[in-house]
């Protein structure tokens, strides 16, 4: 039981480090972007599918 706890703690620790490194890399990539057009395009890509799903859901509710 003790070795299981140790290995789980080790996996958690390594996963946390990996997540931290990924966040740092992502933040560095976001800082490298200088053009606001690229940021706007990325926001639109994230935003438009959500709006489409909401509108289709509302039209389904209103149509009944």
UniProtKB/Swiss-Prot annotation:
Antimicrobial peptide with activity against Gram-positive and Gram-negative bacteria and against fungi. Has been tested against S.aureus (MIC=2.0 ug/mL), E.coli (MIC=3.0 ug/mL), B.dysenteriae (MIC=1.5 ug/mL), and C.albicans (MIC=6.5 ug/mL). Can regulate or mediate antimicrobial response by stimulating mast cell degranulation. Induces histamine release. Shows cytotoxicity toward solid tumor cell line HepG2. Also shows a weak hemolytic activity. The modification Leucine amide is found at residue 62. One of its GO terms (biological process) is killing of cells of another organism. It comes from the Eukaryota. Expressed by the skin glands. Residues 23-46 form a propeptide. Belongs to the frog skin active peptide (FSAP) family. Temporin subfamily. The keyword Secreted applies. GO terms for cellular component: extracellular region. It is found in: Secreted. This is Temporin-ALa. It holds the Pfam family FSAP_sig_propep. Keywords: Amidation, Amphibian defense peptide, Antibiotic, Antimicrobial, Cleavage on pair of basic residues, Cytolysis, Fungicide, Hemolysis, Immunity, Innate immunity, Secreted, Signal. Residues 1-22 form the signal peptide. The keyword Signal applies.
